Amino acid sequence: MRIIVLSSSPNTDGLTAACVRAAIDGARREGAQASEIRINDSDIGMCKACDNGWGTCRDEHRCKVEDGFQKAHQAIVESDALVLVTPVYWGEMSESAKALTDRLRRCEATAGEKSRLQGKPVIAVAAAGGTGNGLVSCLASMERLIQHVGAKRFDMISVNRWNREYKLSTIGQSAAAMVRGMR
C-alpha cells in the first residue's frame, strides 16, 4: 500500500514538517509505504488557464504546462491514499499547495466519476504556526478540493502551536487508521 504525503511548506523543521513526519510514521507503523513529496522543491507553477481555462485538462485530464506537476500528479494517481499537509497562510493553503491543487482539480474534477482520485482516502492537515488563526477556512478549501476530485475525506485535522503535541499524535493515529481501513 502506497501513501503519498504532500508537504507544502518551505521549512523542513517547523510545525508542518512535524505533521508530515507524524503522518509518515503512522502509515509506516501499519506496514504502508509512505513517502513525502515536497511541493516547494518540485518546481510546480500556477495554473495558466490555457485555452480560455480549458486546455488539455478538460478532455485529456492532463496539464500541458510542463514542469514538476506531471511527476507529482502521476505519483498521486498511483498512490492508494493521500495526506495533504499545508501551513495556513492568511486562512488558506500555502501558495505552493494551491498551485498543485488548482491544477490537480482541473485535471481530475473534469473527469467526473472517472477521476483517478475517485474514492481515494485523503487526510487534510492545516498547520497554523503563528497566530493559530485561519484553520477552519483553510480546511474548508481543502474539503472542497477533496469533493471536487471525487476523493474520500478520511480526516480533517487542524494543528497550531498550542495543541501541537497531541495533534501530532492524532495525525499519526489517523494515518495508521486510514491504512488499516484500506486492508
Residue positions per predicted region:
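Short, glycine-/small-residue-rich phosphate/pyrophosphate-handling segment
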Residues: 95-96, 109-155
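N-terminal beta1-alpha1-beta2 submodule of the flavodoxin-like/Rossmannoid cofactor-binding fold
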Residues: 1-113, 153-183
